[in-house]
A protein has these predicted regions:
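Surface-exposed loops/turns
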Residues: 7-8, 32-33, 46, 51-52
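Generic structural signal for well-ordered beta-strand positions
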Residues: 23-24, 50
Length: 74
């Protein structure tokens, strides 16, 4: 998934399931302003493949929050 960091600083990317439970943290570090690509391999924090369904990717950065919907189908 493509994303833009508007201002250099802390960027955190989390994936949640439809129940609002955190599935995995994809990123938590300082990034410079610019365009980035982040990939999710469809696995949870324990390395297990998640089930089919709708997931939400939360991108938190200094300029605010963005949420994206991801559908996993096997």
């Amino acid at each position: 998934m493509d994303m833009r960091v508007d201002r250099s600083g802390q960027v955190k990317i989390l994936v949640f399931n439809i129940a609002g439970e955190e599935v995995v943290q994809l990123l938590n570090k300082n990034e410079s302003q610019g365009n980035y690509r982040v990939d999710w391999d469809g696995k949870n924090t324990n390395g297990e493949t998640v089930g089919n369904g709708v997931y939400f990717v939360l991108i938190q950065q200094l300029s605010g929050l963005t949420t994206r919907r991801v559908i996993v189908l096997k």
